[in-house]
A protein has these predicted regions:
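Residues at or immediately preceding the N-termini of alpha-helices
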Residues: 30-32, 63, 127
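Acidic, low-complexity, intrinsically disordered interaction modules
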Residues: 40-44, 48, 53-56, 61-125
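Short active-site loop/helix that positions an aromatic residue
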Residues: 30-44
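Ampiphathic alpha-helical segments that act as solvent-exposed interaction surfaces
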Residues: 1, 112-141
């Protein structure tokens, strides 16, 4: 996705640059426009793969689909990096690996005074946890 740069004049003395992405959104910072263009690229990739999405869960059949979803989420969660002085994608799920054809849930918990928590679970894991929990009651009955 290309980012188009334009110069505009607000008054005779004030000029500024604005950056327009392919979906028509306008940004005043190039790095923010670049991150949004990356989001559009990864969103298109996820859509082209045919990944099903419902309520924050994604059904990934291949590792390539899983990586596209993780990258898309990274571009959704961009932040300003003071050291680099630009907006950058935040990939909190890069340490998680593809574990086969499954539904993947990506969670984020905001902690006021502590670092935020990010984790991923699969539907198979949740089913196994529920089966184990149910089994303890069936055994004691």
């Amino acid at each position: 996705m290309a980012v188009k740069e334009e110069s505009r004049v607000r008054c005779e003395e004030i000029t500024y640059k604005q950056y327009t992405t392919s979906d028509g959104k306008v940004f005043l910072r190039k790095s923010e426009a670049d991150v949004h263009a990356g989001l559009l690229q990864w969103s298109d990739a996820v859509r082209n793969f045919g990944v099903k999405n419902t309520g924050g869960a994604y059904h990934c059949r291949t590792e390539e689909e899983f990586n596209a979803v993780v990258n898309m989420i990274a571009y959704e969660n961009y932040a300003y990096d003071c050291n680099e002085r630009k907006f950058v994608p935040q990939n909190y799920y890069e340490n998680y690996k593809f574990s086969g054809d499954d539904w993947y849930f990506f969670f984020h918990k905001s902690n006021m005074d502590y670092p935020d928590e990010y984790w991923m679970e699969t539907l198979s894991q949740k089913k196994q946890e529920f089966a184990d929990w149910l089994k303890q009651f069936e055994e004691s009955a």
